[in-house]
Amino acid sequence: MKDRAMQALYLMALEPVSETTADSRSYGFRKERRCMDAVMQCHNILRKGYSPEWILEGDIKGCFDHISHEWLLANIPMDKAILRKWLKCGYIFNKQMFPTEEGTPQGGIISPTLANMTLDGLQKVLAEKYKRVRIKGKLYSPMVNLVRYADDFIITCENRETLEKEIKPLVADFMSERGLTLSEEKTVITNIHDGFDFLGFNIRKFGNEILTKPTKKAEKRFMENIRKVTKGHKGCKQESLIRMLNAKIRGWGAYYQHGATRDSFHRIDHQIFLALWQWAKRRHSKKGKQWIKDRYWHNIRGNSWTFAAKFKKSNGKEDQLTLLKLASSFPFLQYTQIKGDMNPFDADCRLYFNKRMKSKMLVTLKGRKSLLYLWEKQGRKCPICGEPIDTHKAWNVMPTVQDGRKCNLLIHDECFKLSRKNNGNKK
């Protein structure tokens, strides 16, 4: 715990530096940036009719495990003695100590920032080599763009030959200086009309239109998780099953609702229905189809095939819990990409991030004015930890008593659990 606390302390000093020197098109493990920013950047640079058509899909072999200690010690602006101790401390597996001669600290909270700072600079190298030039009075651009999320990255170009003979060797040399190598098997060059997978999305051009939709692997993995729940909880109450499934559906739907997901969502909804039908049939193998349908599926708002269960609330009143459907619960939502030069540690950017946070919360709290009022009244912060209440961390409405009066507060889930645990220990 002491080691993690010390890493957190040094990270507080290092992170503002890393943000200032970071590649503007790097999105992984950075404050206020997320996967969707990287996906939207891909969409923006590839959507036009004259956009680049060739993509290098980069894959680094064991990035976190092979970063050169010498490079880190020479280039990371922090106490070298402390950094050396963290890098050389090794790790314990099955009660056995293993030394570390390369790579960032295993499971260290400072490791993602160290990895980011190692990979930063590639965008600048590419920009300096492939500048816009004027040829016979016309402006010419090689259309070389980098988009990176942690150790996943793509590089675009107007032709395959430049990617294969110039850019790929340049990237390999950049990585080699840092103790890293590209995977020959997984680093491939793809045409945009064939499409490529990036951060769970398949990005492909049809004519002049770019479509970003869930990959087949992502759909398969999600349904495996759904079936794991239905098969692993054969005897649980319908209400409990719905709560478990809704948590997974909500997370998956919120991640993908910014893409072209209509067909994918309908397909997944149907597969979830089939999994639930099998779950119900196993419970009542001697009952007919109509009995099973009437027992578990109900007519709600005109939809007679709504998987729903009645339950009693804490106040004793009866309510109904319904299973979320991806197609109807998560309509397409336009995503606003972060501006590349915005720095969350820069006071001049504070107004931008405040507006961005409010616009996100307006979407999250749409139709719930009382919660929006509560959020503003609390200064947009959790009353327990003082950290922002936003879309990055799970939070909920918690009833409490203040000055002898009942009221509601928006509190982080983790803070609420910790508060209850501490109160229980005091008793």
Each language-model region and where it sits:
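Short, intrinsically disordered, charge-biased short linear motifs at domain edges
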Residues: K366-Y373, V397-D403
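Right-hand nucleic-acid polymerase module
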Residues: V229-Q290
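Histidine-centered nuclease catalytic patch
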Residues: G386-G424
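Duplex nucleic acid-engaging cores and interfaces of nucleic-acid transaction enzymes
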Residues: M1-L9, E19-T21, C35, V39, ...
